[in-house]
From Swiss-Prot:
It comes from Bos taurus. This is Flotillin-1. One of its GO terms (cellular component) is membrane raft. It is a peripheral membrane protein. The gene is FLOT1. The keyword Amino-acid biosynthesis does not apply.
Length: 427
């Protein structure tokens, strides 16, 4: 089963499988009942009132000292906790406090025996540090740490400390009387010095005031001279500036007249230029504009006629080629139909083909020239060389017809010229 303890307590588990014993400060531990044993030890801080009655000091004067010490078993240090468990396990807090108290009192007595009453009385910090240092080194071996030690009280039964106080009081009173007399003396001296310094300061002040008055009058006279000089210079400068200003005004007036005259000349020149531009705009520019307009109109009309003629010629050419293609298609159809005729004309072979082509050529020529018969107007554009007029039209038509055998050859694969020049074969 589990056992727990707070941070101010430690548990020691011994017995089966617990060698050495397990020590747990502020936690929990598992204990097997009956075969393992658990014991607890307190880690609380203990306050000890350490009294040493009638202890003889180094000079043999018996005094009594009371100190306050705070001690506790150190649970964070495993070695000190183990030492404390070995010495105090199973003991109560009172028993542990008694052991620590006896140890501290012994060390306190030892320190008192090595110091005088005056040292203990006047330097309590030194006494406390020595007791703390010596007692700590001894109690550490028991697992106890000294948290703090403070000297609380010192007294004796022989009025030794009281006598020390009386002597000190008398000395203080003596020093006070001496100090009072010296203070009165010093006060008188300082008062006399103060009066002397006051008179000296008054005289010095009057001297300084006289010097200041003299310096003021001298500076005022110099200032008046400078002011009058500056005033005269200012008057002369003003008159000179007035003369310069009048001269500048006259120069500016002359310059204004020159500028006005120059502006009049510029205005006249601008008027002349304006009249010239007006004349040019009224006479020259309209003539040039009209000439330019006529030139542009002529060029536009020329371009329009050229483009119109090219468009019409292209239209005629494309219609002719389209109709020729249609005729060629019909010719191929008829050629297939005439294949049987060709078998009947085995004796004539090429002659039969030539006969059929020649039979259809008038129809082809008629279809090609047909669009020309429906044209209302033919516009011819000449580049300056070649035929003109009707001869030009005739030449164009003949040119189209001259390309007819070539077109037939591309469409049918039969060359009219070659067939015409071959001799007829008989069966």
């Amino acid at each position: 089963m589990f056992f727990t303890c707070g941070p101010n307590e430690a548990m020691v588990v011994s017995g089966f499988c617990r060698s050495p014993p397990v020590m747990v400060a502020g936690g929990r531990v598992f204990v097997l009942p009956c075969i393992q044993q658990i014991q607890r030890i307190s880690l609380n801080t203990l306050t000890l009132n350490v009294k040493s009655e009638k202890v003889y000091t180094r000079h043999g004067v018996p005094i009594s000292v009371t100190g306050i010490a705070q001690v506790k078993i150190q649970g964070q240090n495993k070695e000190m906790l183990a030492a404390a468990c070995q010495m105090f396990l199973g003991k109560t807090e009172a028993e542990i406090a008694h052991i620590a108290l006896e140890t501290l009192e012994g060390h306190q007595r030892a320190i008192m025996a090595h110091m005088t009453v005056e040292e203990i009385y006047k330097d309590r910090q030194k006494f406390s540090e020595q007791v703390f240092k010596v007692a700590s080194s001894d109690l550490v071996n028991m697992g106890i740490s000294v948290v703090s030690y403070t000297l609380k009280d010192i007294h004796d039964d022989q009025d030794y400390l009281h006598s020390l106080g009386k002597a000190r009081t008398a000395q203080v009173q003596k020093d006070a009387r001496i100090g009072e007399a010296e203070a009165k003396r010093d006060a008188g001296i300082r008062e006399a010095k103060a009066k002397q310094e006051k008179v000296s300061a008054q005289y010095l002040s009057e001297i300084e005031m006289a010097k200041a008055q003299r310096d003021y009058e001298l500076k005022k006279a110099a200032y008046d001279i400078e002011v009058n000089t500056r005033r005269a210079q200012a008057d002369l400068a003003y008159q000179l500036q007035v003369a310069k200003t009048k001269q500048q005004i006259e120069e500016q007036r002359v310059q204004v007249q020159v500028v006005e005259r120059a502006q009049q000349v510029a205005v006249q020149e601008q008027e002349i230029a304006r009249r010239e531009k007006e004349l040019e705009a009224r006479v020259r520019k309209p003539a040039e504009a009209e000439r330019y307009k006529l030139e542009r109109l002529a060029e536009a009309e020329k371009s329009q006629l050229i483009m119109q003629a090219e468009a019409e010629a292209e239209a005629v050419r494309m219609r002719g080629e389209a109709e020729a293609f249609a005729i060629g298609a019909r010719a191929r159809a008829e050629a297939e139909q005439m294949a049987k005729k060709a078998e009947a004309f085995q004796l004539y072979q090429e002659a039969a083909q030539l006969d059929m082509l020649l039979e259809k050529l008038p129809q082809v020529a008629e279809e090609i020239s047909g669009p020309l018969t429906s044209a209302n107007k033919i516009t011819l554009v000449s580049s300056g060389s070649g035929a003109m007029g009707a001869a030009k039209v005739t030449g164009e038509v003949l040119d189209i017809l001259s390309r007819l055998p070539e077109s037939v050859e591309r469409l049918t694969g039969v060359s009219i010229s070659q067939v015409n020049h071959k001799p007829l074969r008989t069966a």
